[in-house]
């Protein structure tokens, strides 16, 4: 079957929102605007994002409006009730999540802690939101002496369990995480991911190892990725995409170390011969800068991404379509450390297209999945609509 585009490269700039969503008040996120507030006072230009028309979606500092943008552009609000990474990505791929995952800014409830201790025969310590390196520095020596489980969370719906590899062997830690995964499927907890976080070393020089393992929930329904895979298309997951979807609908998974490594891996993937979807998450915007409210770091990360775009464009083939978007906001100037309920930007371009213009603003991220499904001639998701016709794409 001949498709309009042989390959679609979907890039999610994790948390790079473009202004408060229509229901931001319900999430206490009125006034949030990740891109605008991040770039205020930033003194460097972003020529590639400007050229594509990012400044045409919303007035932004350092990004002027383009008379002839080099991409289709629009923004989308989220239909699902959550503002976390899993919900955003699942909605992009066609699902509408009506029961939000739960976050635990005060730590996990005593009832759950007691259940974990009974289930594992080990005591739980820490039990609060923290960065992984910080919590291991704080509790690592204690864990080595006692064999307790260092349990912590973040602004995302995750439960992380850290243990020294010499004290709790990997297989036991993985077994513990599998048990906790089953336990937290209970709707009263509904935690998105359980993460094993092994570490090594001595007090003062602890180091997390690459033996991390994620135990995610499977998507609550079939996604566009399932449809693509079942119809013989490649679905190449880069970065944490495989974890977000628990491997569902993925034909190949490629790990990345950080944003720049993610772009490297994407460019390598673009240079291969495949037919289908490559799906990249760039997590640093969110994990390193948004949650930590590091506005200068966030702005520089956007600049670094902008600089790599020309390199990516140089490797594109005629039959490629690139989609750049986000999954939620995380305004580094907002109170607290949580995500913000925002519109997401959408930029779509291809070497074989020239007549670019604004697209209709949509009320669900699923229209991205619908566009991808429509391109490859597979079943469209229940939610969202394809943009191909509005883009002037002949099928």
UniProtKB/Swiss-Prot annotation:
Keyword Metal-binding listed: yes
Reactions mediated catalytically: 2-deoxy-alpha-D-ribose 1-phosphate = 2-deoxy-D-ribose 5-phosphate; alpha-D-ribose 1-phosphate = D-ribose 5-phosphate
What name has this protein been given in UniProt? Phosphopentomutase
Q: Tell me what organism the protein belongs to.
A: Staphylococcus saprophyticus subsp. saprophyticus (strain ATCC 15305 / DSM 20229 / NCIMB 8711 / NCTC 7292 / S-41)
Q: Which residues form the signal peptide?
A: none
Q: How is the cofactor bound?
A: Binds 2 manganese ions.
Which cofactors, if any, are listed as required? Mn(2+)
Q: Which residues form a coiled coil?
A: none
Tell me where it resides: Cytoplasm
**What functional role does this protein have?**
Isomerase that catalyzes the conversion of deoxy-ribose 1-phosphate (dRib-1-P) and ribose 1-phosphate (Rib-1-P) to deoxy-ribose 5-phosphate (dRib-5-P) and ribose 5-phosphate (Rib-5-P), respectively.
Query: Where is Mn(2+) 1 annotated to bind?
Result: 14, 327-328
Sorted UniProt keywords? Cytoplasm, Isomerase, Manganese, Metal-binding
Could you tell me which pathway this protein works in?
Answer: Carbohydrate degradation; 2-deoxy-D-ribose 1-phosphate degradation; D-glyceraldehyde 3-phosphate and acetaldehyde from 2-deoxy-alpha-D-ribose 1-phosphate: step 1/2
Matching InterPro entries, A to Z?
Alkaline_phosphatase_core_sf (IPR017850), DeoB (IPR010045), Metalloenzyme (IPR006124), Phosphopentomutase_DeoB_cap_sf (IPR024052)
Name a single GO cellular component.
Answer: cytosol
Q: Which PANTHER family match?
A: PHOSPHOPENTOMUTASE
Q: What Gene Ontology terms describe what this protein does at the molecular function level?
A: magnesium ion binding; manganese ion binding; phosphopentomutase activity
Out of the domains of life, which is the source? Answer: Bacteria
State the EC number(s): 5.4.2.7
